Amino acid sequence: MTSNQITIALTKGRIEKDAVTLLEKAGFNMSFMADKGRNLIFESPDNRFRFLLVKAPDVTTYVRHGVADIGIVGKDVLVEHPTGYLEMLDLNFGLCKFCVASTEDYNPNDHKRKRIATKYPTIATDYFNQKGEDVEIISIQGSVEIAPVIGLADAIVDIVETGSTLVANGLKVYEDICRISARMIVNKASLKNNKEVLQFIRKIESLVGNEEVPFE
């Protein structure tokens, strides 16, 4: 690894694929990642870049500890893990939204104390606090869609892309919370000490056409 090599942590899966496409549009040759196999670490032939394929929640950890200079990850992860990095760009892919969803008999205007199941306790808590509603948050790591169906919760807060999974489980969206997309984050020291990092970010910024978009 060269001293100015940029290490980028990518969220495995759809965000990874969209990120590679974006980098190709920016003029970078990404063919070395075409045949990944089971590999999780890739270096570009010119040694300018090293890519780490990791799970979404780990992207912020790698960037925070300086193992990665840059991370590409969904805004949902940043909301739950908000410190230790700088958020630089909204990349305008990986588009989806946070929603409140439940069964047909759910009444969002019922003022009784609700139980809300979610994999995103921070966003759920903040949302209902802003509404002035007292709710019990139930953290679930697996398939949250079944929680209202089996009576564990009154409703869920989850990420919705097409809504097909909700429909398949007898749920519908009652409230939209906020839009989510892939974001570029950077290690603070890397931004300060490695000029290649800032040049890379500015090159991507010229394609996506924005600076940091605050969370709404």
Curated annotation (Swiss-Prot):
Reaction it catalyzes: 1-(5-phospho-beta-D-ribosyl)-ATP + diphosphate = 5-phospho-alpha-D-ribose 1-diphosphate + ATP
UniProt organism field: Streptococcus thermophilus (strain ATCC BAA-491 / LMD-9)
Gene Ontology MF terms in the entry: ATP binding; ATP phosphoribosyltransferase activity
Enzyme class, UniProt record, top EC level: transferase
Disulfide bonds: none
Keyword Endoplasmic reticulum tagged: no
Family label: Belongs to the ATP phosphoribosyltransferase family. Short subfamily.
EC number: 2.4.2.17
Subcellular localization(s) per the UniProt record: Cytoplasm
PANTHER family: ATP PHOSPHORIBOSYLTRANSFERASE, ATP PHOSPHORIBOSYLTRANSFERASE ATP-PRTASE
Family matches, as Pfam families: HisG (PF01634)
One Gene Ontology term, aspect cellular component: cytoplasm
Location, primary (coarse class): cytoplasm
Annotated InterPro entries: ATP_PRibTrfase_cat (IPR013820), ATP_PRibTrfase_CS (IPR018198), ATP_PRibTrfase_HisG (IPR001348), ATP_PRibTrfase_HisG_short (IPR024893)
HAMAP family attached to this UniProt entry: HisG_Short
NCBIfam families named in the record: hisG
Identification of the protein by name: ATP phosphoribosyltransferase
Source organism phylogeny: Bacteria, Bacillati, Bacillota, Bacilli, Lactobacillales
Alphabetically ordered keywords of this record: Amino-acid biosynthesis, ATP-binding, Cytoplasm, Glycosyltransferase, Histidine biosynthesis, Nucleotide-binding, Transferase
Domain notes: Lacks the C-terminal regulatory region which is replaced by HisZ.
Highest taxon, organism lineage: Bacteria
Keyword DNA-binding: no
Record's function text: Catalyzes the condensation of ATP and 5-phosphoribose 1-diphosphate to form N'-(5'-phosphoribosyl)-ATP (PR-ATP). Has a crucial role in the pathway because the rate of histidine biosynthesis seems to be controlled primarily by regulation of HisG enzymatic activity.
Biological processes annotated in GO: L-histidine biosynthetic process
Summary of subunit composition and partner proteins: Heteromultimer composed of HisG and HisZ subunits.
Pathway: Amino-acid biosynthesis; L-histidine biosynthesis; L-histidine from 5-phospho-alpha-D-ribose 1-diphosphate: step 1/9
